[in-house]
Regions:
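Extended alpha-helical targeting/anchoring segments
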Residues: 1-235
Length: 235
């Protein structure tokens, strides 16, 4: 968690961020008491009619002049830690969707693809399903939140463990922001890569997935990499 005292212009920050690190789930909230500027790349729920999808991210590598999108895909496929982490999260999200979807309808639409951002590449999958009859939005949100990629597996046990281990509240971090239409369609992201400014204190939270093959130094450096686009706004 990075913190700094700063009086910021949320609209200016968001405008800069949209130009330098455009992300599909980006958003900004400006209130008289606080503001949130986000370049979140991760979609948790997209519901249109009876169709639902989730797009978990699990896997990160630094972007360099020697590492293009094709080489990044090769890196992810050969890296045992990244593969284990990704498989774990995908399995968990498929399980969450299976609670609310018709039997046999949950499918991997896109499996282990690479998405490119300003400073990094992400390892991403897209999972789709057909909702059971009479499933309401409350049941969907309850089944899908919090997102598996920011919790871990097994979900309930990990949540209990995190409650005991984490000394500070996450605030908005790893929550969700989105909308529900009058027709019931909805879209929610996962709040990562975000700045929370409250009482002229800006806060950036980052984290990484840990499995048995994880290396502490690698995970620490990955966290800084994830925060870099946001930290650069203060320069």
């Amino acid at each position: 968690k990075y913190k700094t005292k700063s009086k910021i212009d949320p609209l200016n920050f968001f405008s800069k961020l949209s130009k330098t690190n455009l992300a599909p789930e980006a958003f900004m909230i400006r209130d008289k008491n606080y503001s949130i500027i986000s370049c979140s790349p991760e979609n948790l729920i997209t519901k249109k009619g009876s169709n639902i999808s989730t797009k978990p991210i699990a896997g990160t590598v630094k972007k360099t002049k020697y590492l293009n999108k094709i080489k990044a895909l090769s890196y992810f496929r050969k890296n045992l830690k990244e593969t284990k982490e990704h498989n774990m999260i995908v399995d968990m999200e498929r399980n969450d969707l299976s609670k609310i979807c018709k039997v046999g309808s949950v499918k991997l639409s896109k499996q282990k693809i690479v998405e490119e951002y300003k400073d990094l590449f992400h390892y991403v999958s897209l999972i789709k399903g057909k909702l059971k009859k009479n499933i309401n939005n409350y049941e969907i949100i309850r089944a899908m939140m919090p997102g598996g990629s920011v919790i871990g597996c097994p979900k309930i046990n990990t949540l209990n463990l995190l409650n005991n281990q984490e000394k500070e509240n996450r605030n908005i971090y790893t929550g969700s922001f989105g909308y529900i239409k009058f027709n019931g369609d909805m879209r929610f992201n996962i709040i990562i890569r975000s700045i929370l400014n409250f009482k002229n204190v800006s806060e950036i939270s980052v984290a990484s997935g840990v499995v048995v093959d994880s290396n502490a130094n690698h995970e620490f450096n990955e966290n800084f990499l994830k925060a870099k686009a946001l930290i650069d706004l203060f320069k």
